[in-house]
Amino acid sequence: MAKKAREKIKMISSAGTGHYYTTTKNKRNTPDKLKLKKYDPVIRKHILYNEGKIK
């Protein structure tokens, strides 16, 4: 059986609010950790979100 190319990841807020987004990424095309600027509704600002594992 073939291994899945896409992996589920959690994008965790760098502000420490505990807010996160879930998404998928292709681990073959982007082996590095993902960093995206997204909206944090807790502090009502756009901030950096870092990739984390889903447990």
Curated annotation (Swiss-Prot):
Protein name in UniProt:
Large ribosomal subunit protein bL33
Q: Name one Pfam family in it.
A: Ribosomal_L33
Q: Which GO terms describe its biological process?
A: translation
Which species is the source of this protein? Buchnera aphidicola subsp. Acyrthosiphon pisum (strain Tuc7)
Q: Name one GO molecular function term.
A: structural constituent of ribosome
Q: Which UniProt keywords apply?
A: Ribonucleoprotein, Ribosomal protein
The record's family statement is: Belongs to the bacterial ribosomal protein bL33 family.
Q: Does the keyword Ribonucleoprotein apply?
A: yes
The cross-references to NCBIfam families, in alphabetical order and at most eight, read: PRK00595.1, rpmG_bact
Q: Does the keyword Ribonucleoprotein apply?
A: yes
Recorded hits in SUPFAM superfamilies, A to Z, give: Zn-binding ribosomal proteins
Gene3D superfamilies listed in its UniProt record: Ribosomal protein L33 (2.20.28.120)
Listed under GO cellular component are: cytosolic large ribosomal subunit
